[in-house]
Amino acid sequence: MSADKWCARTDLALETQESLKKANTDMRGVNFSEKKLDNGIIVSVVTIDSENAVRATGRPKGKYVTIEAAMLSEGDEECCQAVTRELSKELKSFVKAVCDKRIYAALVVGLGNRNVTPDALGPRCVDSLFITRHIVKEYGRYAFSNENVNSVCGLVPGVMAQTGMECLEILKGVVSEVKPDFVVTIDALAARSTKRLGCTIQLTDTGIVPGSGVGNHRDGINHDNLGVPVIAIGIPTVIDAVTIVSDAVNASRENTAKLMSPKLNGMFVTPKDIDETVKRLAGLLSEGINMAFSNDEYDDYSE
């Protein structure tokens, strides 16, 4: 990073929209709506539907839904339950938009490095999923009390440093064999604002580029590359160190860029209680996904 150029990264379309609005950037094609629910939950929708919007935001066309709940970071049980229900509702809406089947096959992919706590959200989420594909394949849908059970399978592909393969390469092979109707990816994200760490969930129908939030770009996991729709779900667990320094000196008259040390480039900060946070959020995500895919079957097994 040069002394006169730095960039605070974010994976959240909502934060990109806020930055563009603050900078009075041309936002034609960027549509925004917001609704407030009980328990302090805020659901925001950003849609990008023009080439101008793609250039302005640096994001592909599509729909980005953000669920925010400040109490979520505190582990408030009532809030967590409400967010889980809202997540399930939003995911069902995304699934309905990309798949017109009443009974479908879904592949859930937990992206990230299980051995790095802030990045372990995806793998830990998949650990708690209600997996049904093997049972449906072996015994048929009559093995369940509800014959309308969906076929759900999960995968944790690891990271390139562990496997020597791009996640996309692994997924292409799995998708060609399993033939899911759609893929859901779970990944830890990077945020621009500290207030959104651990209490914000983003869903999008555009897929995801693993590692993009921390400047470690890999091949995109999306419809174009996989041949099936990809719904991406993520929660920010880290923030760029440059952002924290920028916020700290923003009120001064100093040139912020000159105060940025090159050593901050590539450095990210995570909350001190990230172990418990990731464990709690992974459970919340898996519960919401199970509810969305269940067709009521999961309720019988979760009691």
Indicate residue ranges for each PLM-predicted region.
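Proline-aspartate-enriched helix->loop->beta-strand connector
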Residues: 175, 180-181
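A structural-propensity feature for long, helix-poor, extended segments
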Residues: 143-174
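Glycine-rich phosphate/diphosphate-binding loop of Rossmann-like nucleotide-binding domains
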Residues: 113-150, 154
